[in-house]
């Protein structure tokens, strides 16, 4: 048994199929119909519980190769967990996977009702425990826990030293990831790692870039010197967890990188940090965008792309003063992509690497390559 307490006073008891213990986090919902392993291992979900709208979870098991990172969300909530998995690439059940990673698994709850609650109230803090089942004690645990915006999440998921990435995109012929070949690399880019997904790095290297992964706290001077010495050709700012406004030191460093006119590309949190660094602070959405079925309009081509998304924050409309808006979300008209007028920078809020999700936005990685050619 596992007990749940939400900050709106809702108390539930359900079945546990993951790790044991007590976890506190922010509750969000995800509308993806597949790719639960990639969702669970996405560093952007650090400190969060994920409710899946897909009612049946576990049918393809899990494997040792599709993780986005070594980090995980706090827990997942599903309507029905299927222990009997069937997939040629599966190595173990989802239950075994969650236990190995220390992730709580909660099933037998009315996920439809929970998602409606989140749509009404917005994202809610929650505590879940396989150890403590007293409502009042769970309420006290939640009351004393820090809000997600006050937690140092990025530092817990970022690289601790400069490293290289060793593979590229998934090969559907071999059903495996292609190893990185130095001979196919034309330019080297620095990746500021705020919690980068593995498949973002795969796609960067798949378009002929070599990704050098730098810790989130890397000083701007170090990167500027590397650029001036032609050791790197540009900078990529990754996705990551938490409130971008909490990363004040990183924002100060990004300001210097912008002033140095280094070509840059940001995704998700990186997109938000580029906006904040230029004086346009982000705002929080009521319940965020989480899923692999979000329609986004490319304002240049008028094409509608179905995208993967995972964010609770957005850049403001005022960004149009210094940037051309390139993409908009068709659910709520929020900004999904920009090209800056004052610097060689492009950024998007959604995830063009998908994983999970459609691959309709993969061209954005090639746009970054084209941007680099001018410098």
Give the role of each language-model region.
Residues 308-313, 350-357:
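Glycine-rich phosphate/pyrophosphate-binding beta-alpha loops
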Residues 16-17, 55, 310, 340, ...:
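Residue-level structural signal for beta-strand termini and adjacent loop
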Residues 1-206, 212-217, 244, 355, ...:
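RNA-binding accessory domains that recognize and position tRNA/RNA substrates
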Residues 188-193, 307-308, 346-350:
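Active-site-proximal beta-strand elements of phosphoester/diester hydrolases
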Residues 104, 188, 263-265, 281, ...:
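Proline-centered loop/turn at the N-terminus of a beta-strand
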Residues 187-263, 273:
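Phosphate-binding active sites in nucleotide-utilizing proteins
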Residues 303-343:
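Catalytic beta-strand/loop cores that center a nucleophilic Ser/Cys/Thr
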Residues 233-306, 358-367, 371-375:
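Cysteine-nucleophile active-site neighborhood
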């Amino acid at each position: 048994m596992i007990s749940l307490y939400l900050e709106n006073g809702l108390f539930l008891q359900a079945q546990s199929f993951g790790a044991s213990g007590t976890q506190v986090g922010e509750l969000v919902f995800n509308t993806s119909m597949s790719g639960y392993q990639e969702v669970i291992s996405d560093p952007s979900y650090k400190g969060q519980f994920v409710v899946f709208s897909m009612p049946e979870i576990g049918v393809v098991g899990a494997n040792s190769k599709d993780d986005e990172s070594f980090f995980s969300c706090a827990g997942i909530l599903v309507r029905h967990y299927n222990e009997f998995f069937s997939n040629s690439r599966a190595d173990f059940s989802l239950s075994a996977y969650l236990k190995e990673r220390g992730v709580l698994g909660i099933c037998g709850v009315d996920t439809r009702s929970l998602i409606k609650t989140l749509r009404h109230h917005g994202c809610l803090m929650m505590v879940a425990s396989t150890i403590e089942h007293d409502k009042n004690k769970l309420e006290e645990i939640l009351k004393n826990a820090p809000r997600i915006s006050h937690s140092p999440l990025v530092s817990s998921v970022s690289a601790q030293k400069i490293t290289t990435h060793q593979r590229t995109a998934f090969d559907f012929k071999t059903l495996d990831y292609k190893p990185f070949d130095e001979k196919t690399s034309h330019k080297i880019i620095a990746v500021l790692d705020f919690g980068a997904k593995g498949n973002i790095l795969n796609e960067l290297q798949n378009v002929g870039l070599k990704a050098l992964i730098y810790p989130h706290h890397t000083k701007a001077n170090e990167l500027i010197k590397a650029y001036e010495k032609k050791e790197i050709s540009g900078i990529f700012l990754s996705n990551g967890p938490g409130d971008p406004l909490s990363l004040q030191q990183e924002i100060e460093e990004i300001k210097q990188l912008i002033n140095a006119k280094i070509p840059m590309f940001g995704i998700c949190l990186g997109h938000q940090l580029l906006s904040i660094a230029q004086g346009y602070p982000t705002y929080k959405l009521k319940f965020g965008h989480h899923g692999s079925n979000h329609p986004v309009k490319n304002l240049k081509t008028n094409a509608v792309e179905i995208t993967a998304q995972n964010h609770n924050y957005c850049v403001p409309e005022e960004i149009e003063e210094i940037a051309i808006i390139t993409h908009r979300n068709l659910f709520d008209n929020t900004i999904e992509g920009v090209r800056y007028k004052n610097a060689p920078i492009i950024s998007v809020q959604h995830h063009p690497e998908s994983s999970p999700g459609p691959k309709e936005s993969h061209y954005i990685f090639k746009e970054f390559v084209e941007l680099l050619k001018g410098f």
